[in-house]
Design a protein with these regions (language model features):
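Bacterial N-terminal signal peptides
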Residues: 6-17
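Mature N-terminal segment immediately following signal peptide/propeptide cleavage
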Residues: 26-69, 76
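A short SAM/SAH-binding and catalytic strip from SAM-dependent methyltransferases
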Residues: 83, 256, 273-290
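Class I S-adenosyl-L-methionine-dependent methyltransferase module
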Residues: 96-249, 345-382, 389
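A Trp-anchored, charged/polar loop motif used as the substrate-binding/catalytic surface
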Residues: 228-235, 253-266
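A short, conserved alpha-helix within the catalytic core of class I
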Residues: 260-264, 286-298
C-alpha cells in the first residue's frame, strides 16, 4: 500500500453532508477532511507508461460549444489526467470535481496544482510559480493570455525564485494535514522541476508531434475563442475558488476497478448532486485492449447521471479521421450522451473501440450535420479547402 494511504487508513471519514439540488456550494467548514475524502474514494495505484504532465489533446476545447448548447452545467464533474480538467471545470461550473487516475503520481501532480492555486494571486503569477519564472511583478496586474505567454517566454527561469516557491508549495501541502512522505514531496518537486526546466515548452512527451503547454493554453474552441482556464480571469477564479474550498478531489484508482469510480458515484449521490460530465480521454481504448471494459461500463451505468449528462472522449486515429476531426489536429474530441451509452449497453454493447467512439458521437459544430463535412474546420481562424482534409 502507498505511504499516503497507509498513514490515513485508520482515519477515513466516509460521511458527506448532502446539499440541496442547485443550491450554492456549502462553506468549507462543512466539507469532510480533504485528505480523508481523497483516501476514502481511492484504491491501490496501477501502472501507466508515461507521466502525463500536460495533455496531448489539442482538440480538448472542441466540445465546449456543444456542451453549452446542451445545458451541461453544474452538478458534479469527473475527469482523468492533468490540467485539461480545469478547462472543463471552468466551462461546466460544477459544485464539486473528482480527478481519478490510475497513477499515484497524478494525485501528487494535482497537489502541486492545488497549492499553486492557493498561493497565486493572478493567472500570471500561477504560471510564474509553476515555471519558476518571476514574470508577475507585484502581482496586481491582469494581462490577457497572449501577454501572459509572452512574459513567461521572455523571462528566464530563476533558481532562487524557484527554490522559494518550491519550499512554499511543500509547506502549503503539509498545511492540509496531508500525511505525505518525504519521498512523495520529492515527486511533487520532480514534477515542479519539469515545469521549470521546459517552461511553456513542456510536452506530454518531449517529441515534436505532441503539443507544448503553450500551444494548449492558446488553443481555441470551434467558435474561435480561447477557452483555456487561464484565458480569462473569470475562468481562472472559478477553478481557484473550487480548489481553495477543497472541491477538486484527486483520487487514485482504475476506472474499471471495483471501488474508486463507484465510490465517487456514491459520494455524488450522497450530496444530492448529479454527474454532468465524465471526461475519460482515450482510457477506454486501453480498457478494451485489456479486457476490462465491461466492469467499467457496468459502473458507468450505475452512476447518478444528470439529464443532460455527457461522456467526453479523445480519439487518436493515427491518420484516420472521423466526422468530428478538425484539420491540423492530432486528436479528435468526441461527445456522447450518457443516456445513449446506457441504452446501447443494455441493447448489447459496442462491437469495438471504433464502434464505441463513433456510434453515438454527437456533431460538435452548430448547424453542421453528422457527415464528413462536420469535420472540415480550421484549427485556427480561417478556412481550409475540403480536398485538403477529406480522405
Amino acid at each position: 500500500m502507498r505511504p499516503f494511504f497507509q498513514s490515513l487508513a485508520l482515519a477515513v471519514v466516509l460521511a458527506c453532508a448532502p446539499t440541496a439540488g442547485p443550491a450554492a456550494p456549502a462553506a468549507p467548514a462543512s466539507e469532510p477532511d480533504f485528505a480523508g475524502l481523497s483516501l476514502s474514494l481511492s484504491e491501490e495505484a496501477g501502472f501507466f507508461p508515461s507521466d502525463n504532465l500536460v495533455s496531448n489533446e489539442t482538440s480538448y476545447q472542441h466540445v465546449l460549444g456543444k456542451m453549452a448548447a446542451m445545458g451541461v452545467r453544474g452538478g458534479a464533474y469527473v475527469g482523468v489526467g492533468p490540467d485539461q480538467n480545469f478547462t472543463y471545470i471552468a466551462a461546466i461550473r460544477p459544485e464539486i470535481a473528482y480527478i481519478i487516475d490510475i497513477r499515484h503520481d497524478n494525485l501528487l501532480h494535482h497537489l502541486l496544482f492545488k497549492a499553486t492555486f492557493q498561493v497565486a494571486r493572478t493567472r500570471l503569477e500561477f504560471v510564474s510559480i509553476l515555471t519558476g519564472r518571476p514574470a508577475h511583478g507585484d502581482g496586481r496586474d491582469n494581462p490577457g493570455i497572449e501577454e501572459i505567454v509572452a512574459r513567461i517566454d521572455t523571462t528566464p527561469a530563476d533558481s532562487q525564485y524557484f527554490e522559494g516557491m518550491a519550499t512554499r508549495i511543500a509547506d502549503v501541502i503539509l498545511s492540509w494535514d496531508m500525511p505525505v512522505t518525504d519521498a512523495e514531496l520529492r515527486v511533487v518537486r520532480r514534477i515542479h522541476e519539469a515545469f521549470r526546466r521546459y517552461g511553456l515548452n513542456l510536452r506530454y512527451a518531449q517529441v515534436p508531434r505532441y503539443p507544448t503547454w503553450r500551444e494548449l493554453i492558446l488553443e481555441k474552441d470551434l467558435e474561435g475563442r480561447r477557452a483555456n482556464y487561464l484565458a480569462t480571469d473569470s475562468a481562472f477564479r472559478f477553478v481557484q475558488d473550487l480548489e481553495r474550498r477543497h472541491r477538486v478531489v484527486p483520487v487514485v484508482g482504475d476506472v474499471a476497478g471495483s471501488h474508486a469510480l463507484a465510490a465517487i458515484g456514491e459520494n455524488i449521490r450522497i450530496r444530492g448532486l448529479r454527474l454532468t460530465a465524465l471526461y475519460i480521454s482515450n482510457v477506454e481504448q486501453y480498457l478494451m485492449r485489456g479486457g476490462t471494459f465491461l466492469p467499467y461500463a457496468s459502473t458507468l451505468q450505475a452512476l447518478p447521471w444528470a439529464e443532460h449528462g455527457v461522456i467526453i472522449r479523445s480519439y487518436f486515429g493515427r491518420g484516420a479521421s472521423l466526422p468530428q476531426s478538425v484539420y491540423g489536429h492530432y486528436s479528435t474530441q468526441l461527445l456522447e450522451r450518457s443516456t445513449d451509452f446506457i441504452n446501447q449497453m443494455q441493447a448489447g454493447g459496442y462491437g469495438s473501440y471504433i464502434d464505441l467512439v463513433t456510434r453515438n458521437a454527437l456533431p460538435l459544430k452548430t448547424g453542421v450535420g453528422t457527415g464528413a463535412e462536420a469535420g472540415i474546420q480550421r484549427r485556427f481562424s480561417g478556412s481550409t479547402p475540403a480536398a485538403a482534409w477529406l480522405p
